[in-house]
Amino acid sequence: MDEMRKDPTRGQWVLVRPKAKAAQAGECPYCPGAEHLTPPEIAAYRKDGPGPNGPGWTVRVVPESDPYFRVERELVREGVGMFDMITPRGASELILESPRHDDTLASMEPEQLEAVLWMYRDRLLDLKRDSQIRDILVSRRHRKPGVPPHHPYSRVTAIPIVFDETRRELREAREYYQYKRRCLYCDILRQETGAEERVVRLTKAFVVLVPYAARLPLETWVLPRQHGCSYEDAINGEAAPELARLLSGLFRALERGLGDPSYELLVHTAPNLRSRILQGDWATIRDDYHWHIEVLVQPERANRLGGIFISETSPEVAASRLREAWEPEA
């Protein structure tokens, strides 16, 4: 039986489950016309076509065929002697980003990428209606080493706990706010836009930058200039097209400058505020946390020594390279 077990020495959760069966080679189940090969769709944007579970879609959401987390499970929190266990209730979804099998975030038109960003918002809003879901990760991996090219998709993972990375970020943001009564990320924005040496792109609503202590060469953040803790509350008719144009420009710059490298996109947004367990949980989160997007370029090349990241390229040089590779605006 699948279950989540907590390591009390590190405060981390581990998912224990049998190894998934390898996918059979053959027809791509995510291309138009093969909708019968996937579980029934959860959501879709369609311009035409016969309706649900048929062709004509522009963006489509389906459950993973062998999901890590299932919404049908009963949430059970149990003590096993001194240890803690939780059933992996949640959701494991794939957002099929384009009908085209060979599309990438660099090759698709900004309008198509904008539709993907709207679907990110829709899935976060829908899943956060479930108070047993505590945190949701929206991620996108491109060109994972050892994995053949496949239909473009993002992954949505909803879980009954808070992800370790989210928990660390929330703690740092809260402690900074408690000490200074200011948002950590708003201060980063003021510092970086004033200095400019690590800024790659600056628009009315967003800043693209290489962070001061980048863990990887060309690690890039996209931060909204207007404070807000949740991605889904910030995406609107003005923000979505601007963010799509920026991300399109970033991925094309990476392709032009590095020859289509691997990367991982992560949407960092507040956990599900409906799932508060204790009275004081996230009491200041709307003031202290700031949603953003992180792009980790070639994450498989991360170099660490005892948990300390070692970057062989300074963030200032990395930002300069990205500025040079960015396609001039028409």
Label every model-predicted segment.
Residues 1-151, 157-234, 251-256, 260-263, ...:
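Active-site microenvironments that recognize anionic phosphate/pyrophosphate groups
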Residues 236-246:
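Gly/Ser/Thr-rich active-site loops/lids in small-molecule metabolic enzymes
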